[in-house]
């Protein structure tokens, strides 16, 4: 009898220690019956009962404030072509010059080429070295103009040399032609047509025979005479 009581007390002590060590099994260890929750009036009227573990749902309204951001207006300015002085000398390193009018005043800017930066595109983007140099279009225009001037001066010298050579040859040929004509006139002076082989009768006037030169020789003689007179005037 005493041994059975001690065994019962030991079992009770083990059960209590187990319940204290695992509190989530206290409900299972309890010998009381858990009362079932009563159904609400609405559920009893509708005939459907809520589950015992379902918590009451509370509706809450949240106010959200939405902020709208207005985009910035896209303002564009009309661009104009720079004057010739600015277009040739203002922008550097093959940059493009353009102007923008603000309050009726032109503001000049440069559109830099790839690899350059700065107000006048005078800096490199890598090491910021200063490279002021004249734009290539200006140098190309200067070279073309100088080449055209050299060609024009050369043509003038060639034309002048040909003119002087022609004048010299014309003067020489005109002088030789004049000498030949003078010699022919001296040989035929005092002779008449009727008495080349015999003397003229008394009272007959001698007729001087004028020898006419061919047409091409007369034309050449006229040109040479004109050239001589023109050279004497100069």
From Swiss-Prot:
Residues 29-143 are lumenal. Residues 78-122 form the EGF-like domain. Residues 33-71 are annotated as: Disordered. Residues 1-28 form the signal peptide. One of its GO terms (cellular component) is endoplasmic reticulum membrane. Glycans are attached at residue 74. One of its GO terms (biological process) is determination of genital disc primordium. Proteolytic processing by Rhomboid occurs in the Golgi. Cleavage takes place within the transmembrane domain close to residue 144 and the active growth factor is released. N-glycosylated and O-glycosylated. Interacts with Star via the lumenal domain. The keyword Cell membrane applies. InterPro entries: EGF-like_dom, Gurken/Spitz. This is Protein spitz. One of its GO terms (molecular function) is epidermal growth factor receptor binding. It comes from Drosophila melanogaster (Fruit fly). It comes from the Eukaryota. It is a single-pass type I membrane protein.
């Amino acid at each position: 009898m005493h041994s059975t009581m001690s065994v019962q007390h030991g079992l009770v002590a083990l059960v209590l220690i187990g319940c204290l060590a695992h509190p989530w099994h206290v409900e299972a260890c309890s010998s009381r019956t858990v009362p079932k929750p009563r159904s609400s009036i609405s559920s009893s009227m509708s005939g459907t009962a809520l589950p015992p573990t379902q918590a009451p749902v509370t509706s809450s309204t949240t106010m959200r404030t939405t902020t709208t951001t207005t985009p910035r207006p896209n303002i564009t300015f009309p661009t104009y072509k720079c004057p010739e002085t600015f277009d040739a000398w203002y922008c550097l390193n093959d940059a493009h010059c353009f102007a923008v009018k603000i309050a009726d005043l032109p503001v000049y800017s440069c559109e830099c080429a790839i690899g350059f930066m700065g107000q006048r595109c005078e800096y490199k983007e890598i090491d910021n070295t200063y490279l002021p140099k004249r734009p290539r279009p200006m140098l190309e225009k200067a070279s073309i103009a100088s080449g055209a001037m050299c060609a024009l001066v050369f043509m003038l010298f060639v034309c002048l040399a040909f003119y002087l050579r022609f004048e010299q040859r014309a003067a020489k040929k005109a002088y030789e032609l004049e000498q030949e004509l003078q010699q022919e006139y001296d040989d035929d002076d005092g002779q008449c047509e009727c008495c080349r082989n015999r003397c003229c009768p008394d009272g007959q006037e001698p007729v001087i025979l004028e020898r006419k030169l061919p047409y091409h020789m007369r034309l050449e003689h006229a040109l040479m005479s004109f050239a001589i007179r023109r050279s004497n005037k100069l």
